[in-house]
Amino acid sequence: MEQQLTFYSYPSCTSCRKTKHWLKAHQIEFNERHLFRETPTREELKYILSLTTEGIDEILATRSQTFKNLNLNIEEMTVNEVLELLIEKPKLLRRPILVDNKKLVIGYNPGELLKLSKKKTVHQSA
């Protein structure tokens, strides 16, 4: 059975709102999770990382004020330390994050979102 699309978002994030609108317009079902209230678990983060092509750099919000304030050197951290940090400070994650059983999309990217829509059975729940 195919895993439903999980959409990690933050309501005041413009990219998240655009992505949500795009998903609804294309009738793609998704399970929305508030990134800061329902932080991804360690296992979910490991799975998300396994779908990246650039590793942690792909999901880390290096331009965020949180990242700048922490003055981190990610290269010196272990994977476990990075995972713990992301669970503790989810504002370090780029958003939105969309993940299903084989595909990951970070940010509002209509071209990448279109790839999701092509592999999903498109139907809207009432």
From Swiss-Prot:
Keywords recorded for this protein, A-Z: Activator, Cytoplasm, Disulfide bond, Redox-active center, Repressor, Stress response, Transcription, Transcription regulation
Superkingdom of the organism of origin: Bacteria
Cellular localisation: Cytoplasm
Effect of R42E: Destabilizes MgsR approximately by half. No change in activity
Location (main, coarse): cytoplasm
Effect annotated for changing C13S: Loss of activity. Strongly diminishes expression of mgsR and of the MgsR regulon
Keyword Glycoprotein: no
Gene3D superfamilies in UniProt: Glutaredoxin (3.40.30.10)
Intrachain disulfide bonds: C13-C16
Gene deletion effect: Deletion of the gene results in differential expression of approximately 70 genes in response to ethanol stress compared with the wild-type strain.
InterPro entries listed in its UniProt record: Arsenate_reductase-like, Thioredoxin-like_sf, Tscrpt_reg_Spx/MgsR
Record Pfam families: ArsC (PF03960)
Inducing stimuli: Expression is sigma B-dependent. Induced by ethanol, heat and salt stress. Positively autoregulated.
GO cellular component labels: cytoplasm
Xref: SUPFAM superfamilies: Thioredoxin-like (SSF52833)
Effect on the protein of changing R37E: Destabilizes MgsR approximately by half. Strong decrease in activity
Documented activity regulation: Activity is controlled at multiple levels. Regulation includes a positive autoregulatory loop on mgsR transcription and a post-translational redox-sensitive activation step by an intramolecular disulfide bond formation in response to ethanol stress. In addition, protein stability is strictly controlled by rapid proteolytic degradation by the ClpXP and ClpCP proteases. The McsB protein-arginine kinase might serve as a proteolytic adapter for the ClpX ATPase in the degradation mechanism of MgsR.
Family membership: Belongs to the ArsC family.
Entry function: Regulates transcription of a subregulon within the general stress response. Exerts positive and negative effects in response to ethanol stress.
Protein name per the record: Regulatory protein MgsR
Taxonomic lineage of the native organism: Bacteria, Bacillati, Bacillota, Bacilli, Bacillales
